[in-house]
Amino acid sequence: MERKWWDNCFRAFRVRSVALHMTSLLTSRRDFLRVSGGCLAHVMLMSACASRSTRQRWTAPANPTVTTTPFARLDLIAPDTWAVISTPLGGDRTTYANGGIIAGRNGVIAVEGFYRPAGATWLAERARELTGKWPTHVVLTHYHVDHASGVSGYRAPGGQTPALRATTATRDLAIGGGPVAPPKDDALLRAYADVVIVNATAHSRIDLGNRQVELVPLSGHTKSDVAIVDENADVTFAGDLLWNGMFPNYVDATPTALRASMQQLANRTAHTFVGGHGAVANASAVSRYLGLLDDIERAARTGLTAGRTPAEIAAAYAVPASLGEWMASKAGVERAMTAWARALG
């Protein structure tokens, strides 16, 4: 029965891969190598294994919606704070990842660079409509293509560019042309030429006048992740350290650091959390996610100790029903078990 479920999942993914090709996501061998192990393909593969109702629930709104497009929704999650909830399963991948807007008296933060410049421009225009200001700051949570390749779209019509903030590692990886990084070209290099470096070893702040927004350096999803936290508004943008309703992507992960980073964020139990993919999360959803991370670790340690390969462990793994509904696939689970095998030596 388990084997049949996985086989059906892969058949579904092959069908969806054709759709991806037709929408020009995989337009070349170079593009395929970039996305096949990254979050672009990961999201499509995980969702291919899910029912239509599950796919619809994955990004269901829990907060007032300000605007809806074919590729994303903008929800009000706190005063002067909005979450971008991307809805790529419909076929439009303009933003692809989640992000947001944090507005203050003296400035506006845009969270994430998104997949395409049009996604960044769309968010900047929404910020101007809602706050009267074009973004003054752009903060990247990490370097993956769906979060970092569209930053050039934040250039204002008059030519003014918001301050782009990223850690040194995120900047270097974003322009390094790696397998899951943005495509390296002159436009990308120009967009990253004047990055304001975020401290990767200590918390830093952006002063928006009437609110202080904290940049928390972490790691786990990649070697350098940043969470954006407003303690007064009880809001945390966690990037891909947090996945809601979808099995996380371990392509770059350090599993022990991922768990520790998420626990650090989860201690803010009153916060509204915006993860990198999926609906807005509350403390209960974050607790289920931590439970999933723990169960993945348990399965990996048990299987590896018994001498099984990551593929064998993945083939036998199923998310416990007690953790609720998670979109998952054999490929994603095997990638997680492989990451644990690396971590445990």
PLM region spans:
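Metallo-beta-lactamase
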Residues: 107-109, 115-117, 212-302
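Short, low-complexity, charge-dense intrinsically disordered segments
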Residues: 2-5, 11-15
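Short acidic-hydrophobic surface loop/beta-edge motif
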Residues: 74-77, 102, 202-208, 275
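C-terminal segment of N-terminal export signals and the immediately downstream linker at the start
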Residues: 17, 47-84
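N-terminal secretory signal peptides and thylakoid transit peptides that target proteins
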Residues: 13, 18-44
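Accessory terminal helices/loops
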Residues: 7, 23-25, 42, 54-64, ...
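Conserved beta-strand hairpin/beta-sheet module of binuclear metal-dependent hydrolase folds
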Residues: 75-126, 227-239
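Active-site HxH/HxHxD metal-binding segment of metal-dependent hydrolases
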Residues: 128-207
